[in-house]
């Protein structure tokens, strides 16, 4: 863990051992897995689709004593942490949290000794309890426990030490631990989204680079809107963002460092450059550049230097995206007469078309799991869909009037995109899971477009 948030051995409660307990891997399939003692452990199987979300209780987290911190009292933070955890789990579409106000007030000793009979009568199948404690050095400790109500047993416990200002990160980490333990899937709640904030009339939009947590919290603007910005993309290190900006009315690719606010020009050429994206190792940026009326895909070291041309077709080649291992690139091209999806080796060799459905395809993005490619489907509207890397198994996930610009969550189970309203023209950020059932609006202060979902934070 980083210095911002670190795991903590839960020694604050006498019933807990001095080392953190890590959950066992769930069984490969089924609603539950048999353990050595023949008790059945809860499991949410998300591969076959969810007919009924799991009832789960996340009561207010108690504190040994209410202490004032820079982020409020620990008593207030206990309520807020529980609320964030509950909202995270609900947003996945896999869980139905009980209404917090209707739940039993958990005392501090009860954190490690749940009243199973009460929680069983409440209808909850799983229980998330914890605590918030102020430390002498000004930090907070947030404890996180998951219990199987039916089996009356603990499934995991973890703890996180954070600065008071970072209490939401501890909540997201707890939700991630619960999600992973119950589904077997990787976490994604403790992550951020960078996007384009928009305001103003259609013919004179003010566009600013902005960043926020994946749930819309901790929002801040990164640019002032003096120059138009487009297509931000996170680096694998979570510390930098590449994007297109019209400084001096000339589109150029830049890299923005989140910690310092430093901005650096990547490709210093008079040609139009756009659609940048980092390689998985963060050492290369792949992008499109127009030369003599022809648009092809190039790559350049992040530090700058000579750009290498990867495609040479007479059409428009753009929107490149690396495979997770960096060996291949998916991109869109109209070389066949309409926008379609192609895959090539990272050096530009072996270019092959993979999309053959009706309509046109744009903005392909490789899943971090490596198994799917998300895209925008154009035909009777704009829709977000996925296909396998050989082009088979195409599935349309959204049915809005204009849904586009997909970006994968860190675990490859959820896709962020932006939606344009038919009548008003307003743009909003949304997410959808791979079933296409669980759509979620991502709140932003103003209109939003071009989301880029960053990697999981350390």
Swiss-Prot record:
Pfam families: PD40, TolB_N. The lineage of its organism: Bacteria, Pseudomonadati, Pseudomonadota, Alphaproteobacteria, Sphingomonadales. Belongs to the TolB family. HAMAP family: TolB (MF_00671). Transmembrane segments: none annotated. The gene is tolB. It is found in: Periplasm. Keywords: Cell cycle, Cell division, Periplasm, Signal. This is Tol-Pal system protein TolB. It comes from Zymomonas mobilis subsp. mobilis (strain ATCC 31821 / ZM4 / CP4). The Tol-Pal system is composed of five core proteins: the inner membrane proteins TolA, TolQ and TolR, the periplasmic protein TolB and the outer membrane protein Pal. They form a network linking the inner and outer membranes and the peptidoglycan layer. GO terms for cellular component: periplasmic space. GO terms for biological process: cell division; protein import. Part of the Tol-Pal system, which plays a role in outer membrane invagination during cell division and is important for maintaining outer membrane integrity. The keyword Transcription does not apply. Residues 1-23 form the signal peptide.
């Amino acid at each position: 863990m980083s210095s911002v948030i670190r795991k903590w051995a839960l020694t604050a409660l006498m019933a807990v051992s001095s080392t953190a307990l890590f959950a066992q891997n769930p069984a490969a399939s089924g609603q539950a897995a048999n353990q050595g003692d023949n008790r059945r452990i809860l499991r949410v199987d998300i591969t076959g689709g969810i007919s009924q979300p799991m009832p789960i209780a996340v009561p207010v987290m108690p504190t040994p004593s209410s202490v004032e911190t820079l982020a409020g009292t620990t008593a207030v933070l206990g309520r807020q942490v529980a609320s964030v955890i509950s909202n995270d789990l609900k947003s996945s579409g896999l869980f139905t949290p009980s209404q917090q106000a209707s739940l039993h007030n958990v005392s501090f000793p009860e954190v490690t000794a749940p009243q199973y009979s009460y929680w069983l009568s409440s209808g909850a199948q799983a229980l998330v309890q914890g605590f918030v404690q102020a430390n002498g050095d000004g930090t907070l400790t947030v404890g996180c426990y998951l219990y199987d109500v039916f089996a009356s047993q603990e499934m995991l416990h973890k703890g996180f030490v954070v600065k008071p200002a970072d209490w939401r990160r501890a909540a997201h980490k707890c939700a991630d631990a619960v999600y992973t333990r119950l589904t077997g899937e990787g976490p994604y709640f403790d992550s951020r989204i960078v996007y384009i904030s928009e305001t103003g009339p259609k013919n004179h939009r003010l566009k600013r680079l902005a960043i926020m947590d994946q749930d819309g919290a901790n929002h801040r603007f990164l640019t002032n809107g003096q120059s138009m910005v487009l297509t931000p993309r996170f680096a694998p290190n979570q510390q930098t963002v590449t994007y297109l900006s019209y400084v001096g009315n000339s589109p150029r690719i830049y890299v923005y460092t989140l910690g310092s606010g430093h901005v650096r020009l990547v490709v210093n050429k008079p040609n139009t450059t756009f659609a940048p994206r980092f390689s998985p190792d963060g050492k290369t940026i792949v992008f499109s550049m127009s030369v003599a009326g022809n648009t092809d895909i190039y790559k350049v070291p992040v530090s700058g230097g000579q750009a290498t041309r990867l495609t040479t077709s007479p059409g428009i080649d753009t929107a490149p995206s690396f495979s997770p291992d960096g060996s291949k690139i998916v991109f869109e091209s109209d070389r066949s007469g309409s926008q379609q999806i192609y895959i090539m080796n990272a050096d530009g060799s072996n270019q092959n078309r993979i999309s053959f459905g009706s309509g046109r395809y744009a903005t392909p993005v490789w899943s971090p799991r490596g198994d799917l490619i998300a895209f925008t489907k154009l035909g009777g509207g704009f829709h977000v869909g996925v296909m396998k890397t050989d082009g088979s198994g195409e599935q349309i996930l959204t049915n809005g009037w204009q849904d586009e610009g997909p970006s994968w969550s860190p675990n490859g189970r959820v896709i962020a995109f932006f939606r344009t309203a038919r009548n008003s023209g307003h743009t909003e950020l949304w997410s959808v899971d791979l079933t296409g059932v669980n759509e979620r609006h991502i709140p932003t202060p103003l209109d939003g477009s071009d989301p880029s979902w960053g990697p999981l934070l350390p």
